[in-house]
Curated annotation (Swiss-Prot):
Keywords: Acetylation, Repressor, Ribonucleoprotein, Ribosomal protein, RNA-binding, rRNA-binding, Translation regulation. The modification N6-acetyllysine is found at residues 37, 105. This is Large ribosomal subunit protein uL10. Belongs to the universal ribosomal protein uL10 family. Gene3D superfamilies: 3.30.70.1730, 6.10.250.2350. PROSITE patterns: RIBOSOMAL_L10 (PS01109). The lineage of its organism: Bacteria, Pseudomonadati, Pseudomonadota, Gammaproteobacteria, Enterobacterales. PANTHER family: 39S RIBOSOMAL PROTEIN L10, MITOCHONDRIAL (PTHR11560). Part of the ribosomal stalk of the 50S ribosomal subunit. The N-terminus interacts with L11 and the large rRNA to form the base of the stalk. The C-terminus forms an elongated spine to which 2 L12 dimers bind in a sequential fashion forming a pentameric L10(L12)(L12)2 complex. Two L12 dimers associate with a copy of L10 to form a very strong complex (called L8). InterPro entries: Ribosomal_uL10, Ribosomal_uL10-like_sf, Ribosomal_uL10_bac, Ribosomal_uL10_bac_type, Ribosomal_uL10_CS_bac. GO terms for biological process: cytoplasmic translation; negative regulation of translation; translation. Forms part of the ribosomal stalk, playing a central role in the interaction of the ribosome with GTP-bound translation factors. Protein L10 is also a translational repressor protein. It controls the translation of the rplJL-rpoBC operon by binding to its mRNA.
Length: 165
């Protein structure tokens, strides 16, 4: 379907606005994936706070200008599906990684986080980032473990002091 100039400008404005508020972006090639599977992916994306859109490469290049995702420009080749993580930096990467496991034809091209290009081979770096809740839980576990260790060492020191006296 041919797009007129106003439609193209609207697409660029929409994607650019989303890019400015996004935490990370992942680019993939969805050629060969069935419509049903793509619908499932889009639904999972909405639930995970991921904005997904298939956009023409020239429009996408214009949309990412001046954003931290400008480093992805070289990945805009062939059919391009872009996903922006809006709530958690690893959400889109995690979603695409899981989807690629189940669908051999789905290929992750690259990702970007804080202006750094992450090649597809290293997508796990972004996908394994803990969520906010997971990070807080790990921190609390570490703090709790450290205080318990201090208590044990203190009690051992008191016991040793009593035995020495």
């Amino acid at each position: 379907m041919a797009l007129n100039l106003q439609d193209k400008q609207a697409i660029v404005a929409e994607v650019s606005e989303v890019a400015k508020g996004a935490l990370s972006a992942v680019v993939a090639d969805s050629r060969g994936v069935t419509v049903d599977k793509m619908t499932e992916l889009r639904k999972a994306g909405r639930e995970a706070g991921v904005y997904m859109r298939v956009v023409r490469n020239t429009l996408l290049r214009r949309a990412v200008e001046g954003t931290p995702f400008e480093c992805l420009k070289d990945a805009f080749v062939g059919p391009t599906l872009i996903a922006y993580s809006m709530e958690h930096p690893g959400a889109a990467a995690r979603l695409f990684k899981e989807f690629a496991k189940a669908n051999a034809k789905f290929e992750v091209k690259a990702a970007a986080f804080e202006g750094e290009l992450i090649p597809a081979s290293q997508i796990d770096r972004l996908a394994t980032l803990p969520t906010y809740e997971e990070a807080i839980a790990r921190l609390m576990a570490t703090m709790k473990e450290a205080s318990a260790g201090k208590l044990v060492r203190t009690l051992a020191a008191v016991r040793d002091a009593k035995e020495a006296a």
